[in-house]
């Protein structure tokens, strides 16, 4: 079972986002979809729901509401959490890295 989410370091994770996520995702309001969807407003939204992005059926049918904890569970191993997702990212195995990234995302995607 994945470790529980704990608030991390937003500064450390801005760099993690740039090196691990930015090539496929944007976070700013009105930002474009890239290979992956724009993540603005993701917390509180259900999986597969960003307007204008073409999700796999697996993402649409998962129906999970994104919270800090569900995002942590997903980012540990995306393909295990949502079998059939097209997200190619292998995941973040270290709970601290996930916590830092999610802390950054929670602020950057408001």
Curated annotation (Swiss-Prot):
What InterPro entries has UniProt attached to this entry? Cyt_c-like_dom (IPR009056), Cyt_c-like_dom_sf (IPR036909), Cyt_c_1A/1B (IPR002327)
Q: Which SUPFAM superfamilies match?
A: Cytochrome c (SSF46626)
Q: Where would you say this protein principally sits, based on its record?
A: mitochondrion
Q: Which domain of life is it from?
A: Eukaryota
Give the UniProt subcellular location, in the record's own words.
Answer: Mitochondrion intermembrane space
**Binding positions for heme c?**
21, 24-25, 87
Q: Which UniProt keywords apply?
A: Electron transport, Heme, Iron, Metal-binding, Methylation, Mitochondrion, Respiratory chain, Transport
Q: How is it modified after translation?
A: Binds 1 heme c group covalently per subunit.
Which residues are modified to N6,N6,N6-trimethyllysine?
79
Entry GO terms, CC: mitochondrial intermembrane space
One Pfam family recorded for the sequence: Cytochrom_C
Which GO terms fall under molecular function for this chain's record?
electron transfer activity; heme binding; metal ion binding
Q: Which family does it belong to?
A: Belongs to the cytochrome c family.
* Functional description taken from the UniProt entry: Electron carrier protein. The oxidized form of the cytochrome c heme group can accept an electron from the heme group of the cytochrome c1 subunit of cytochrome reductase. Cytochrome c then transfers this electron to the cytochrome oxidase complex, the final protein carrier in the mitochondrial electron-transport chain.
Q: What is this protein called?
A: Cytochrome c
Instruction: Give the originating organism.
Output: Schwanniomyces occidentalis (Yeast)
